[in-house]
Design a protein with these regions (language model features):
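Iron-sulfur cluster-binding cysteine motifs and their immediate structural context
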Residues: 1-10, 26-45, 55-70
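Conserved AdoMet/S-adenosylmethionine-binding subsite of the radical SAM
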Residues: 75-178
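Mature, well-folded catalytic/scaffold domains that follow N-terminal targeting or propeptide regions
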Residues: 21-24
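Pocket-edge positions in alpha/beta enzyme catalytic cores
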Residues: 13, 19, 42, 66-69, ...
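Cysteine-rich micro-motifs
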Residues: 19, 47-54
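Glycine-rich, flexible loop/turn motifs
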Residues: 11-12, 68, 84, 159
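Thr-Gly-centered strand-to-loop micro-motif
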Residues: 16-18, 45-46, 98-99, 127
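FAD-binding FR-type
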Residues: 49, 70-76
């Protein structure tokens, strides 16, 4: 997912693609919050009413409504990862923890890395480097971590501020730390 802004929030989110809507009305029927309506542009959601229960997305065969993220436990994520264990074993690959920004979810990522390592799956930490140095060191020093990817958007502070909105200073400090 590579530092996608829609994955930074710690909650489920719903994406609307009105052009995919076939007008079946199923989403309106199953929405107990009465947050979905149809207009000239297709389906739309009143975000102030939506509870993000995902009942509408579960029944949307046209993918006009779909979850962009959902809350999962370490066990649920690991169950998905383990489906590809044979591939990892044959290629030397493993789990890549990213985000949003992995440092924003360091405690969860650490628990996932540990659980994967206990099952013989190595991990790679993929980060923009913008986060806690302590969290970064904690993650990359775990026994299951074999690789670290740093996605540095720009090394010039002015350019970084223009495109990312923050100074590159903390990012470069974290790179030097490793």
């Amino acid at each position: 997912w590579c530092h996608n802004p829609e994955l930074i929030e710690n909650e489920q989110q719903l994406i609307v693609s009105p052009s995919n809507c076939i007008g079946c009305g199923h989403c309106v029927e199953v929405c107990s919050a009465h947050a979905i309506s149809f207009g000239d542009a297709g389906v739309s959601i009143d975000r102030s009413r939506c509870t993000v229960c995902l009942a509408c997305a579960d029944g949307c065969f046209a993918n006009a409504l779909r979850p962009v993220a959902r809350l999962m436990t370490v066990g649920e994520v690991l169950a998905e990862v383990e489906k590809d264990k044979g591939f990892y074993d044959n290629t030397g690959g493993g789990l890549t923890v990213s985000g949003g920004e992995v440092l924003a979810h360091a405690e969860f990522a650490g628990a996932l890395i540990d659980a994967a390592a206990a099952r013989g799956i190595s991990s790679c930490v993929d980060t923009s480097g913008f986060g806690s140095s302590r969290a970064l060191l904690d993650l990359v020093s775990r026994p299951g971590v074999t690789d670290v990817l740093f996605d540095i958007k720009a090394v010039d502070d002015e350019v970084h501020r223009e495109f990312v909105g923050v100074s590159v200073g903390p990012v470069l400090a974290n790179v030097r730390l490793l």
